[in-house]
């Protein structure tokens, strides 16, 4: 009986942890180009699907040429602006090798750079930043310590902090952030492209479904709408995920964890991606 009570209490605590800082329900997109410039199709998409958040990649962080220190790379320029009703979430992609050892001032530099970019470009509707990193079990501790430092830097700004979560990272302890954006794409091995779609295949997602319900972090769900074009031995190969496959995976994820339908993100905002799928497909992807 004591063991049973302990198990019940543990389960309740996990549920409370997931609900401690609930995600705001809504629709979002990633913006991953190096110049913020929207055409009429992209603006219409934001309005039609009631997009209230744009996760905008501000810059990457990579190791410098001699491999000693991280440096910013591929910084975005702002030739345009988003509608005032949309919250912009500065997003920074950090290569995993930057987390092979601690860099004590990295968190401070990143936050200061984001704040400076916001001020320079008169970007005011910011309440959160997101860090994207494909951390592994070996780099996890360094990355989580780094996230704690970022949170400390953000405390005076009263910003939230989120991070991307890849499917393989569901087996690890949850990171110290307010919520995670679960990346439900790039799930396969590109070397086996003739057998399965490396962008998204239900068979690659299936083994991770059982880990969803016990993951103790609020999660948004990010789905792919992009195309991957590669040259393989002189042959142009295009990878596009069928709408039916996206929806099959979405339904399976939400059956295992119902709150995954609360906050939906598509990757990424682009005219070609918008035209790749029918409006009814986007309606179903963004259905709560």
Question: Where do the protein language model's features map onto the residues?
Answer:
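Bacterial lipoprotein signal-peptidase II cleavage site
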Residues: 13-19
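Chitinase-like catalytic core of GlcNAc-active glycosidases
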Residues: 20-32, 60-182
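Substrate-binding surface in catalytic domains of secreted glycosidases
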Residues: 141, 148-232
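Conserved beta-strand positions in the central sheet of alpha/beta enzyme cores
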Residues: 53-55, 130, 181, 265
